[in-house]
C-alpha cells in the first residue's frame, strides 16, 4: 500500500518540477527580451507613421524612433551627421555633396529577399526625396525641398543635391523628419498603407500600432 502512494508522490513531484522549470524558462526568455522592447503610450491620436506626412508633434516623435535622414540636430540645435558621415557645399552654395555611411541597414522585411534587409544607398535618398516632392503624393513636408533643383546618386555612397539658388538654411531643413530615407520596394508595395507599415533605419522597428 505504501509503494503505490510513494509512486504517486514521486510522480507528482516530478511533474511539478518539470512545470516549474518550463515556466521558469518562459519567464526568463520574456525577461531577457523585455529590455529590447519600447512601449509607448500617446495621449493624442497618431495620424501616420510615414515620415513624409509627419507634421504633428505626436507623429514626428514616433517617426524619430523609426527613421533617419542625412543629418540630425543635437539638443543645442547643432547640425550633426546621421546617415551622411560628412558633406561638402560648393563655393557657389548650389551643390551639396554627402558621403554616406555604408553600415546602415533597413529594418528587416520579407521584400528584401533572402537576407531580409539591405544597406541604405544613395539611390534610396534620391527616391525618398523625389517622393517627398511629388505633387501626386501631396506630402505636407514637400515645402522643405522648394529650393531644390535635382537629386543625384553619384554612386552607392555619394549623394548630391543641387539647388536653384543659394540657401544657407537648407542643411538645417534636411534634419526634419520629412527628409527621412525609406526603401522604394516597401513603400511602393504598401502604397498609402505605408503609413501603418513603416520600414526605416531608426533604433526601433514598429511591432504594432
Give short role names for the model-derived ranges:
Residues 23-24:
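C-terminal motif of bacterial Sec signal peptides marking the signal peptidase cleavage site
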Amino acid at each position: 500500500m505504501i509503494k503505490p502512494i510513494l509512486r504517486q508522490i514521486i510522480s507528482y513531484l516530478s511533474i511539478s518540477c518539470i512545470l516549474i522549470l518550463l515556466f521558469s524558462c518562459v519567464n526568463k526568455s520574456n525577461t531577457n527580451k523585455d529590455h529590447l522592447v519600447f512601449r509607448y503610450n500617446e495621449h493624442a491620436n497618431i495620424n501616420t507613421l510615414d515620415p513624409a506626412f509627419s507634421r504633428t508633434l505626436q507623429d514626428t516623435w514616433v517617426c524619430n524612433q523609426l527613421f533617419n535622414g542625412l543629418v540630425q540636430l543635437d539638443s543645442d540645435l547643432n547640425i550633426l551627421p546621421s546617415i551622411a558621415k560628412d558633406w561638402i557645399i560648393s563655393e557657389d552654395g548650389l551643390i551639396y555633396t554627402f558621403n554616406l555611411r555604408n553600415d546602415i541597414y533597413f529594418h528587416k522585411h520579407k521584400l528584401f529577399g533572402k537576407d531580409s534587409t539591405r544597406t541604405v544607398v544613395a539611390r534610396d535618398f534620391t527616391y525618398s526625396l523625389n517622393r517627398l516632392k511629388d505633387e501626386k503624393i501631396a506630402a505636407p513636408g514637400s515645402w522643405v525641398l522648394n529650393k531644390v533643383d535635382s537629386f543625384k546618386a553619384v554612386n552607392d555612397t555619394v549623394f548630391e543635391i543641387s539647388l536653384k539658388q543659394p540657401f544657407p538654411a537648407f542643411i538645417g531643413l534636411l534634419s526634419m523628419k520629412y527628409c527621412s530615407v525609406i526603401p522604394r520596394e516597401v513603400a511602393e508595395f504598401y502604397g498609402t498603407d505605408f503609413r501603418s507599415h513603416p520600414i526605416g533605419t531608426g533604433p526601433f522597428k514598429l511591432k504594432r500600432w
